[in-house]
Amino acid sequence: MAAKKAGKAGATKDRNNQVVASNRRARHNYAILDTYEAGIALMGTEVKSLRDGQASLADAFATVDDGEIWLRNLHIPEYQHGSWTNHAPRRNRKLLLHRREIDNLIGKIRDGNLTLVPLSLYFTGGKVKVELALARGKQAHDKRQDLARRDAEREVVRELGRRAKGMS
């Protein structure tokens, strides 16, 4: 048997951890306390649309109904080549977690002033996963402090780079 030829690096698409959508505003608007990886119940046309890289987590959030966690306002556009069996773009989608994880999340949400926010949507081993965060909303002054801290860190890194190059 002939051995397979090695291809160019990066020539094949890495389907193991392909990020479809990320919610960058969530890290700005919320203080992330804990993250969970959850499966998501999807229809076939939704998966095909996600493989095309089409999704928006901008207004998405998760809620608890009857001991189940649902993802609401996730926008997955209709599959372009779909027929009359296409899905509704903003339908509610069930998140798949272990019962003990669900009970743990429900307890934490009820105890504190916390919410569930999706951070990213990605493929792992051919399955769609959602990175879900247990988060607390930030006030305006908290957001300003984070921006100031990030600017200060950026300045320190810039100055260290200058000193390393001998430009002092």
Swiss-Prot record:
CC annotations in GO: cytosol
Keywords: Cytoplasm, RNA-binding
Compartments where found: Cytoplasm
Major site of localization recorded for this protein: cytoplasm
Biological process terms in GO annotation: trans-translation
Gene Ontology MF: a single term: RNA binding
Record Pfam families: SmpB
Main function: Required for rescue of stalled ribosomes mediated by trans-translation. Binds to transfer-messenger RNA (tmRNA), required for stable association of tmRNA with ribosomes. tmRNA and SmpB together mimic tRNA shape, replacing the anticodon stem-loop with SmpB. tmRNA is encoded by the ssrA gene; the 2 termini fold to resemble tRNA(Ala) and it encodes a 'tag peptide', a short internal open reading frame. During trans-translation Ala-aminoacylated tmRNA acts like a tRNA, entering the A-site of stalled ribosomes, displacing the stalled mRNA.
Family (UniProt): Belongs to the SmpB family.
PANTHER family: SSRA-BINDING PROTEIN (PTHR30308:SF2), TMRNA-BINDING COMPONENT OF TRANS-TRANSLATION TAGGING COMPLEX (PTHR30308)
Name of protein: SsrA-binding protein
